[in-house]
């Protein structure tokens, strides 16, 4: 394994979501009683843990391929790679986005990488990936 990075939801975001879900728990508790409130609290807590796991994005580079989530591509089909700062990735995922591009982005990640795809059988022009360590990812892909 040459490179591995996991992008996870920040704790402040999970805390806000949990707070809003707790208002639902309080409503259930006040309307239906203690047992229903405890069940709702357990369900909400489990939902937050599931959300934390489900929204994580795993980026891996080994000797043969690049894996981003469930998608993967052989390193031989990777073209030019560009490390994007906050402003550049904001433009790349909005105004300058190509509808055929593969997007593996998380709104809470402020940096990323744009990887061109050189495969004549694939209509995907590039992959846009959220990454906090873009330079390291590019180095791992190119070596």
Model-derived segments and their meaning:
Residues 16-21, 40-47, 109:
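Lipid-exposed faces of alpha-helical membrane segments in multi-pass integral membrane proteins
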Residues 32-41:
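Short, aromatic-rich membrane-interface segments at the entry and exit
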Residues 122-143:
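C-terminal/domain-terminus segments
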């Amino acid at each position: 394994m040459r490179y591995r990075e996991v992008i996870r939801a920040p704790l402040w975001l999970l805390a806000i979501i949990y707070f809003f879900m707790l208002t639902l728990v309080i409503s259930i508790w006040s309307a239906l009683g203690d047992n229903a409130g405890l069940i709702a609290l357990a369900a909400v807590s489990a939902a937050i843990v599931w959300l934390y796991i489900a929204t994580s994005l795993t980026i891996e580079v080994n000797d043969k391929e690049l894996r981003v989530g469930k998608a993967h591509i052989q390193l031989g089909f990777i073209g030019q790679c560009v490390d994007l700062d906050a402003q550049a990735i904001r433009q790349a995922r909005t105004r300058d986005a190509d509808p055929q591009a593969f997007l593996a982005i998380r709104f809470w990640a402020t940096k990323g990488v744009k990887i061109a795809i050189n495969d004549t059988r694939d209509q995907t022009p590039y992959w846009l990936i959220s990454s906090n360590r873009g330079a390291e990812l590019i180095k791992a892909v190119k070596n």
